From Swiss-Prot:
Mg(2+) binds at residues 10, 387. GO terms for molecular function: acetate kinase activity; ATP binding; magnesium ion binding. It comes from Serratia proteamaculans (strain 568). Catalyzes the formation of acetyl phosphate from acetate and ATP. Can also catalyze the reverse reaction. Its cofactor is Mg(2+); Mn(2+). This is Acetate kinase. It is found in: Cytoplasm. Its EC number is 2.7.2.1. Substrate binds at residue 91. Gene3D superfamilies: 3.30.420.40. GO terms for biological process: acetate metabolic process; acetyl-CoA biosynthetic process.
Length: 400
């Protein structure tokens, strides 16, 4: 077995995704999800050696109990896995302006993650808990913990992309600017697209679409991010599962002044009750929207708004390509599986020369990659993302 095994941790506010990955060949030795933290049904599901398992963590359990279970129960059955761990990689949603690349975790890095809490109030505190618990659970790897920032890939954006047209003092004194998210995914598919196009990565011009429960589009010019749809927080941009994406900011004043909603109520509505859920009034699940597009008005409405917004971003970002767009890339749970989303979106972009191939499009689902456009059309590709592999590779490289 390889000795480049990395434990990858992705701590959310109420969940913890984990995996043990070989940073050299990408092989996954363990993967799982602990979820429903702080609730009676807190549980852990995992897959090891091809077999699936599930266990209750106990009422009210959270990150600490989950990591304890991973170390003392799951890994205790395979001590050779623990023994071969060389590093721990942590996904960090927001690194502010401080981090332009992944970093070995020390006091300064921890402070930087704390400083960015206002921009990711749900995620960054959970990441800090995950780091603290990992240091406790794996004392031998104390200096081998690496933070991989979702914002890092976007730090190459020029000022005209990241500044808002607000008083400049808000940026100068309070760091209010566009940061973006999903950077690790956009980075990964950019590398993979360059291989598929047989070009050096610094020569590719792409528009990458990471579409999942959260979604963002990134303009990649000469291999670097020059603009992205998420903003100061992950609320800006596309229609998402429960997030509104772009709205007229004055809607907030209207909701407050005319409808008597509190700031907390408005925040909750925009982040947890909008997007596909808000438009369907039924669900945030894109599969419902696809399955019922022809038969239900709520599904059609949601799908049409979703694809309209996505097509607008792709069209806008084509203006940043210096006259050469190599491909549009679809990734993420929706981007990889929702053939209808891709077809309806690309059908709006005939001006850019996209012609979808229906058979290819329906074949490129469920983990399969490839071109979904006709020969002679401008290229659109499906590339399944692998953020965990990037995190494992960065952790391995920085601690070697």
């Amino acid at each position: 077995m390889s000795s480049k095994l990395v434990l990858v941790l992705n701590c959310g506010s109420s969940s913890l995704k984990f995996a043990i990955i070989d940073a050299v060949n990408g092989e996954e030795h363990l993967s799982g999800l602990a979820e429903c933290f702080h609730l009676p049904e807190a549980r852990l599901k995992w897959k090891m050696d091809g077999a699936k398992h599930e266990a209750a963590l106990g009422a009210g359990a959270a990150h600490s109990e989950a990591l304890n279970y991973i170390v003392n129960t799951i890994l205790a059955q395979k001590p050779e896995l623990s023994a071969q761990l060389t590093a721990i990689g942590h996904r960090i949603v927001h690194g502010g302006e401080k981090f332009t690349a992944s970093a070995v975790i020390n006091d300064e890095v921890l402070q930087g993650i704390k400083d960015s809490v206002p921009f990711a109030p749900l995620h960054n505190p959970a990441h800090l808990i995950g780091i603290a618990e990992a240091l406790k659970s794996f004392p031998k790897l104390a200096d081998k913990n690496v933070a991989v920032f979702d914002t890092a890939f976007h730090q190459t954006m020029p000022e005209e992309s990241y500044l808002y047209a607000l008083p400049y003092s808000l940026y100068r004194d309070h760091s209010v600017r566009r940061y973006g998210a999903h950077g690790t995914s956009h980075f990964y598919v950019t590398q993979e697209a360059a291989k598929a196009l047989n070009k050096p990565v610094e020569e590719v011009n792409l528009i990458t679409c990471h579409l999942g429960n959260g979604g963002s589009v990134t303009a990649v010019r000469n291999g670097k991010c020059v603009d992205t749809s998420m903003g100061l927080t992950p609320l800006e941009g596309l229609v998402m599962g429960t997030r509104s994406g772009d709205i007229d900011p004055a809607i907030i004043f209207h909701l407050h002044d005319s409808l008597g909603m509190s700031v907390d109520q408005i925040n909750k509505m925009l982040t947890k009750e909008s997007g596909l859920l808000g438009l369907t009034e039924v669900t945030s699940d894109c599969r419902y929207v696809e399955d019922n597009y022809e038969s239900k008005a709520d599904a059609k409405r949601a799908m049409d708004v979703f694809c309209h917004r996505l097509a607008k971003y792709i069209g806008a970002y084509s203006a940043l390509m210096d006259g050469r767009l190599d491909a549009v890339i679809f990734t993420g749970g929706i981007g990889e599986n929702a053939g209808m989303v891709r077809e309806l979106t690309l059908n709006k972009l005939g001006l850019l020369g996209f012609e979808i191939d229906h058979e290819r499009n329906m074949a490129a689902r469920f983990g399969k990659s490839g071109a979904i456009t006709k020969d002679g059309s401008r290229l659109a590709l499906v590339i399944p993302t692998n953020e965990e592999l990037v995190i494992a590779q960065d952790a391995s490289r920085l601690t070697a």
